């Protein structure tokens, strides 16, 4: 069975044996594979569209905001130990990546940004709702 649904949860719902996540480098012999197998199905990203109003308009600080979580989203003096040193790009690259017409910007940044890695397949519907709400909150923290 090949499950190509959004969440990849048809096999679980059907009671079919399944395996999820990325295989390890030892399993695949691929340099791009992670060193250890994981259960990441697909990152959840709540994309944000922002508008530049030309003046300081800052959203309220989200509860639990920790600037260290996003310190290496782009190259800066506070980025000391990036998770992926080869992928730390400039702030200009980040802004250009999501530039839209009419002074708007799409915020969809995979590099220590607003991608939220979670395995929704193994969760109950209630747990999924909480996790998805947290993913939205995570994007708000990144925007802040």
Locate each region found by the language model.
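Aromatic-residue-lined binding/catalytic grooves and analogous aromatic/hydrophobic interfacial grooves
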Residues: 1-144
């Amino acid at each position: 069975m090949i499950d190509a649904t959004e969440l990849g949860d048809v096999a679980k719902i059907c009671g079919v044996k399944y395996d999820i996540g990325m295989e390890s480098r030892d399993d695949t012999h691929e340099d791009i594979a992670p060193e250890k197998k994981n259960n990441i199905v697909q990152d959840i990203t709540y994309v944000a569209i922002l508008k530049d109003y030309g003046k300081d308009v800052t959203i309220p600080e989200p509860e639990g905001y920790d600037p260290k979580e996003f310190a290496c989203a782009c190259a800066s003096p506070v980025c000391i130990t990036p998770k992926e040193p080869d992928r730390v790009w400039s702030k200009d690259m980040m802004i250009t990546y999501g530039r839209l017409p009419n002074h708007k910007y799409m915020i969809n940044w995979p590099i220590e940004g607003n991608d939220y890695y979670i395995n929704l397949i193994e969760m109950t519907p209630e747990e999924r709702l909480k996790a998805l709400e947290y993913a939205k909150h995570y994007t708000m923290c990144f925007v802040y």
